[in-house]
Every structure is written in structure tokens, then in C-alpha cells.
């Protein structure tokens, strides 16, 4: 098999991810068949899965099946190392956490608990998660048996229609069903900068994702105060440049300059290390995790004088 630019074409496998809500009143299969919720659920799945694999160009949803009360997501993996990264996220619970966080607003829930199961063919991989090599071999043995489902392309077209007229640097789009496209490029394509139809959910609204700017740094540094360290700890989970002892070093180096400069330099280091991956979505999620919703609203330009959302 011919290798792609990054060698991903040499390793292709498939698996099924089963999702079931542990909340009695939430039936995922029913929710996904609701046209008002389908787009938001699809976006939530795409976002969480892309986070877990740390790359959207090697993990692709081929089809979403409804099997009451479950959703069954057929996945295509391209690249052994990144498939291993997905397995690690699944094993350590990071995927479950991401799915619960992303799907809760899509289902109009404040919180959501999910039960997951991972299968490759007849093998239930949950029984072998500590043996990553075995899991990888099972996934590799299951070659994708289909092309990407046409319905998923239609969902992404719908998402683009919702967001294609958003050319500003930020802002939210209020829609009945919130969700967005997370495009999956081929392994040989360079990962593009966030486009207008790459969005994320914030309090049930679609927000256009984009790289962070100098203005974002200033807004963050002006308002975050003592919590800049806590936000840094949230960001450091997926940013090696912020891992210990980086935060302590920043605090010491800029102690005389005050909290504003410490917070400003935190985002500066994040943006330098991550480049175009230092996005508004990642910062907003870190702020929400640390109960700094009002600051997130300021960054999104959604804050009203009375503190509400635009």
C-alpha cells in the first residue's frame, strides 16, 4: 500500500464506538433521529473524537448507526501512533470526559454521563485496553468496509450553511440546533487554518473558532487575575510548553510586573508553542473549566452590560 506524506496510508484500521447515556431520560438513538438535534450531536462527536486523537486528519467517522438506546459510531483510523493515542485517551477516560462535555449542551443537558464500549469486529477491546499492542492489531485487522456515509457529508454542508456568512474574528450564531463542521482532510493535505465553518458550542450557540490574537491576550490578562495559574493548568494538559515547571517559572520571572503580565505571558507562551492550534475554543474551554464564564463571554464579544449573553 502506498504511503502518504506522513506515512499514514501504511496503517489503516476500523473500530466501532458504542455510546449509551447513563441518564434515564436521555436516549441517544432517539435524540440523533431528531432533526433539531442531529447536527449538534454530530458536531459534538467530531469535536470530542478529534480532541482524543489530537489530530483530525487521521480519525474519521464513517457512519453513525442508531441501535436503541445506543449510538454506534464506525471509525476509520489512519496511522498507528495516532490510533494508539486514541486508545490511550479511551483507556484513561479522557475520551469519555470530552464526549460528556461536548454532548451535554447538544442534548440540552447541564451534565451527561455516558457508558462507552469499543469493538473491533467480534472483539470487545475494553477487555484488552492494558494491552495496547493487541488492541492495535485487532483494529488493523478490521479494514474499513465502506466509504464515508453520504448523510455525514450532508450534515457538514448544513453546518457550513449556518456559518459560512461569519467572516468576523469571533461572535456567536444563535440557532435552534447548535453544532459545527470539523472538516477531515486527507493525510497528504496540510492541516488548514481554522475556517469560517469550523465552530464550537458555547451555551447552546455556535461560535466561530479562530487562532488567538493579541486582543485576546490583552482581554484575558486584564480580567483573569489570580486564576491565570488555574487556566494554565487546564491548558497544559495538551500543551507541553506549559507543563511543570513552566507556570512556576512564569510566576517567578514576572512577579514584579504583576498579574497582568503573568497572565499575558502565559497566553504568549501558549500561542508561540501551539501556533495555529492555539485557538479560541481551547481557551474558552479552559476558562469554563475554571468557572470563568464571564471572561469567556468577553472574549466572544457576547457580554451585555447586564452580564447576559448577546
Swiss-Prot record:
Xref: PROSITE patterns: DEATH_DOMAIN
Position of sequence motif Nuclear localization signal: 229-242
Motif (Nuclear export signal): 147-163
UniProt domain Death: residue ranges: 213-303
Positions glycosylated per UniProt: 243
GO CC annotation terms, alphabetical: cytoplasm; cytoskeleton; nucleus; plasma membrane; tumor necrosis factor receptor superfamily complex
Reported function: Adapter molecule for TNFRSF1A/TNFR1 that specifically associates with the cytoplasmic domain of activated TNFRSF1A/TNFR1 mediating its interaction with FADD. Overexpression of TRADD leads to two major TNF-induced responses, apoptosis and activation of NF-kappa-B. The nuclear form acts as a tumor suppressor by preventing ubiquitination and degradation of isoform p19ARF/ARF of CDKN2A by TRIP12: acts by interacting with TRIP12, leading to disrupt interaction between TRIP12 and isoform p19ARF/ARF of CDKN2A.
Assembly and oligomerization: Stimulation of TNF-alpha receptor TNFRSF1A leads to the formation of two distinct signaling complexes. Plasma membrane-bound complex I is composed of TNFRSF1A, TRADD, RIPK1, TRAF2 and BIRC2/c-IAP1 or BIRC3 which interacts with CHUCK/IKK-alpha, IKBKB/IKK-beta and IKBKG/IKK-gamma promoting cell survival. Subsequently, TRADD, RIPK1 and TRAF2 dissociate from TNFRSF1A and form cytoplasmic complex II with FADD and caspase CASP8 promoting cell apoptosis. Within complex I, interacts with TNFRSF1A/TNFR1, TRAF2 and kinase RIPK1.
Name of the protein in question: Tumor necrosis factor receptor type 1-associated DEATH domain protein
The species this protein was found in: Mus musculus (Mouse)
Lineage, highest ranks first: Eukaryota, Metazoa, Chordata, Craniata, Vertebrata
Gene transcribed to yield this protein: Tradd
Amino acid at each position: 500500500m502506498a504511503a502518504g506524506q506522513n506515512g499514514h496510508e501504511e496503517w489503516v484500521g476500523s473500530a466501532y464506538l458504542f455510546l449509551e447515556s447513563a441518564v434515564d431520560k436521555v436516549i441517544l438513538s432517539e435524540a440523533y433521529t431528531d432533526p433539531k438535534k442531529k447536527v449538534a450531536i454530530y458536531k459534538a462527536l467530531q469535536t470530542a473524537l478529534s480532541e482524543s486523537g489530537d489530530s483530525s486528519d487521521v480519525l474519521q467517522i464513517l457512519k453513525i448507526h442508531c441501535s436503541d438506546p445506543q449510538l454506534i459510531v464506525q471509525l476509520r483510523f489512519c496511522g498507528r501512533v495516532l490510533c494508539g493515542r486514541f486508545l490511550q485517551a479511551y483507556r484513561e477516560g479522557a475520551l469519555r470526559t470530552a464526549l460528556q462535555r461536548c454532548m451535554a449542551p447538544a442534548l440540552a443537558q447541564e451534565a451527561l454521563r455516558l457508558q462507552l464500549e469499543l469493538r473491533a469486529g467480534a472483539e470487545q477491546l475494553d477487555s484488552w485496553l492494558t494491552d495496547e499492542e493487541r488492541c492495535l492489531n485487532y483494529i488493523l485487522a478490521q479494514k474499513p468496509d465502506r466509504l464515508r456515509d453520504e448523510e455525514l457529508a450532508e450534515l457538514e454542508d448544513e453546518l457550513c450553511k449556518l456559518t459560512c456568512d461569519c467572516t468576523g474574528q469571533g461572535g456567536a450564531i444563535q440557532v435552534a440546533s447548535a453544532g459545527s463542521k470539523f472538516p477531515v482532510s486527507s493525510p497528504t493535505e496540510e492541516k488548514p487554518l481554522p475556517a469560517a465553518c469550523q465552530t464550537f458550542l458555547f451555551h447552546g450557540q455556535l461560535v466561530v473558532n479562530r487562532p488567538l490574537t493579541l486582543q485576546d491576550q490583552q482581554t484575558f490578562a486584564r480580567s483573569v487575575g489570580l486564576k491565570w495559574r488555574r487556566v494554565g493548568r487546564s491548558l497544559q494538559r495538551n500543551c507541553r510548553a506549559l507543563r511543570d515547571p513552566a507556570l512556576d517559572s512564569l510566576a517567578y520571572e514576572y512577579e514584579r510586573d504583576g498579574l497582568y503580565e503573568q497572565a499575558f505571558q502565559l497566553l504568549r507562551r501558549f500561542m508561540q508553542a501551539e501556533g495555529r492550534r492555539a485557538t479560541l475554543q481551547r481557551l474558552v474551554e479552559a476558562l469554563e473549566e475554571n468557572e470563568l464564564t464571564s471572561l469567556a463571554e468577553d472574549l466572544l464579544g457576547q457580554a451585555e452590560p447586564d452580564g447576559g449573553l448577546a
